[in-house]
Amino acid sequence: MESRLFQVDAFAGRPFTGSPERIGPDGSLRKFFMLDPAITYLNHAAYGATPRPVFESFQRWQLDLERQPVDFLSRYSTERLAHARAVLADYVDTDRDNLVYVSNGTTGLNIIARSIPVGPNEEVLSSDHEHGGIDRLFRFASQKLGFTYVRREIPVPVTTHADFIDRFWGGVTERTKVILLSHFTSPTSLLFPVEEICRRARAAGILTIIDGSHVPGQFPLSLRRLDPDFYVGILHKWVCAPKGCAFLYARPSAQGLLDPLIVSWGWAPKNPGPSKFVDFHEWQGSRDVSEFLAAPDAIAFQAEYDWDTVRSQCRELALYAQREVTRITGIPPYHSTPEWAGQVVCANLPRHIGNPDDFKNRLRFEHNIEVSVDVFRDQPRIRISIQGYNTIGDVHALLAALQRLL
């Protein structure tokens, strides 16, 4: 199907000629999600959505906390969190004590940014496709620590992985001490070939920080194979865990570089655990950790419902949606071959739409469609997310609305 949807000239404005009624999930998973049925929801990449069985597990943990807070937090949380980390470690292919749960990707990357050994006359190399919040974080850190934050321009449309790697690596200098790079980009929805970047960086003695916020659950992930120094992934997005569930990975050789963002009992603990890294970052004072304990149930839910197949169906529908929006606008997207794409795709919109927030709100309040509309390099773009609860009918609703509004 990919070869039919995507050829080199696939965005020449010609209509799709396949069988669109057979593209994407069949709608049977919708019953598990609590999203408002009156809304065509095409923005899963923003905050995710949790299926009811996983949400009910989350609530059971919360009730357990309220029944006996001391048992829950003081007596049993360490053991329970260790189990939850073990399940997650198996899912992302690493060892249990290389991971800690954090509330979101921003928290995990703040831990790293405030600890990395880089200062004046040294550089952190990144790209101009990074998440706005993380871009702001490293601009802030550069002012505090004195390093230079370099945003390497990656032209679009991207072409080949080899060209990307050469282009990005061309920004490395003798002052480059750290590389910060998205695995799957938030503003442009591109799967960057970070494995080769990590390999080159390790050979050059450069630390790697990979923002994998959109990767777990959307793509297979092997941290053992990827081998970054630091990796942050979000679980409440594509794994569909409860909100506020993410993880921080640190390679064993790099764990000692990270100071706790919040210093508490894990610093010089009375009863040290097997991992100082976990001690430092897991206990952050009194807080509800129910979302972390429910993460294994989210992983199990997707395994039960053959999520590898669901992902493939979603990706196929996402590529179809991108092609059809491009046919409407006549503006090429950020890539012309499918290896860059996942369940989230972007398509450019004409500049005459005006303010992107206003256009997004017109889709929401005039057409009951929730979808991301923003700007990349002064060009408006729409970002379409396809999850297992979506069907081709959702995409057709969006296409009809765009034809009316454009």
Language-model features, listed with the residues they occupy:
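Active-site phosphate-binding strand-loop segment of PLP-dependent enzymes
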Residues: 148-150, 159-213, 217
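Structural signature of PLP-dependent enzymes
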Residues: 72-74, 276-323
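PLP-dependent enzyme catalytic core of the Aspartate aminotransferase-like
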Residues: 28-31, 170, 353-355, 361-406
